[in-house]
UniProtKB/Swiss-Prot annotation:
This is L-carnitine:corrinoid methyltransferase. It catalyses: Co(I)-[quaternary-amine-specific corrinoid protein] + (R)-carnitine + H(+) = (3R)-4-(dimethylamino)-3-hydroxybutanoate + methyl-Co(III)-[quaternary-amine-specific corrinoid protein]. Involved in the degradation of the quaternary amine L-carnitine. Component of a corrinoid-dependent methyltransferase system that transfers a methyl group from L-carnitine to tetrahydrofolate (THF), forming methyl-THF, a key intermediate in the Wood-Ljungdahl acetogenesis pathway. MtcB catalyzes the methylation of the corrinoid protein MtqC, using L-carnitine as the methyl donor. L-carnitine demethylation generates the unusual biological product norcarnitine, which is likely degraded by other members of the gut microbiota. In vitro, can methylate free cob(I)alamin. The gene is mtcB. Keywords: Methyltransferase, Transferase. It holds the Pfam family MTTB. The lineage of its organism: Bacteria, Bacillati, Bacillota, Clostridia, Eubacteriales. Transmembrane segments: none annotated. It comes from Eubacterium limosum.
Amino acid sequence: MIRNSLTDVFFAKDDVENLHEGVLRVLSKVGVKIENDEALGIFEQHGARVENGTVYIGEVLLNKALQTVPANFELQGFDRTVQVGLDHDPVVIPTNGTPMVLNFDGSYSDTNTDDLVNFYKLIDTSDVMQVTSEIAVDVPGLDKTKDSLLAQTALLMKYSHKPIYNILGATIHNYKKGSVAQGVRENIQFAKKYYGYDDKYVIYSGTCVISPLGVGWEAMDHFMGFIKENQPISITACSMTNLTAPGSLYGSVVEDAAAILSIVVLSQLMNPGLPVLYTSLSSMSDMRYVQLCMGAPEFALITLGHIALANFYKIPVRVGGALGDAFKADYQAGVESFVGLMAPMLSQSAMIPHGCGTMGSFNLTSYEKFIMDEETIRYLMRLRRGFEVSDKRKEKALKDITKVGPRGNFLGGRTPKEYREDNYLASEVFNRKGCKENTREEQGDIRDRARKVYDARMEAYELPDTTLEQKKLLNTELPEQYKFDI
């Protein structure tokens, strides 16, 4: 298995300490703007300096908060749990929040509720996705004359066996019967009631800080609601170099880390021991087009910088993903996905967001790319596992080599155990059958193979075996066309 993190290739211990020193200076000298009076009062009560809505956090307070951040935690789904944290392999979660879909026929369309259901089924039948999430939010197909916050959560729950990541935030547009803060908590309480647990982590969520060095009022309402309801939070930075972050990658990492840590500290002051995820989706800007570039190599470098810092702070880190700037499931999309997935997969990461399907700088998701990205993840999981080097393996291999000798062959009898353990046999998505004319005709294009996998998964999908009470609860919020017949 992997013995050293990829971060060690790029950052020496002194480098990480240098980054940390930069973070401390930003936290204590520049501060973070927090748009929530209650939070400002909590910071002040614990000794932080607060001036005109800006919080200044010193090293002592930071270290105190870091001591209570759990290294690991468990997410509860409908009928399964997932272990997340520093002592586990990365948990892969799907794309979320993309407003457009690239369809199998090559057309583009706005993501709608039917797309949501299709992707929920795809996620639920995935062998690499351990958590599900809203693919997009506030989409066409929802009744916008009504509050749609809980309707979208109910739709996700109906089709999911797996634990859920709730990218959906309460807003003044999808929750009108009260404040945003009330909507956040009602959504969480709905999830607790559906799963039947008040003392487990049944829904984790997060939102973005505002770069540079701010946390807006809606984000604060979101964070505060989850902290008070004792559910895990993901604190996300998504800055752009030379626009909302300095031009240097060093500056990008340090600035974002300070903003993320401000909410880590708040969470532990309010609810010591609450699981938090340190999340970065920041990347470079291409100033020729003033465009965020999620497929750039700098995205991987920024990601690795944040992994190194989060590991230094002993906070579970959620970074990277099969992201990119391509708008077709083409060679560019594949390269970008691999670069974005490689950094967290070959290091000590707790979770990988946007694991499958995302492209177009967060604006687009693709059915076929989702299937292809799953195979990329399997390849990287195989790389992460490495291969066994031991006296037992050595003696067996040398015995076989000695027995066969020069110019022999090793084919004979049953396939040996070590072959089955050491070799990953790719799925039908990738071709490994050669390239003769009949093979080319039989295999077709990779998009055709992805479509076959998709169709088989849709046919194999089965709804969770919900109780009558759970069905009734979901029916109170589900969009009309998705209600259970009971």
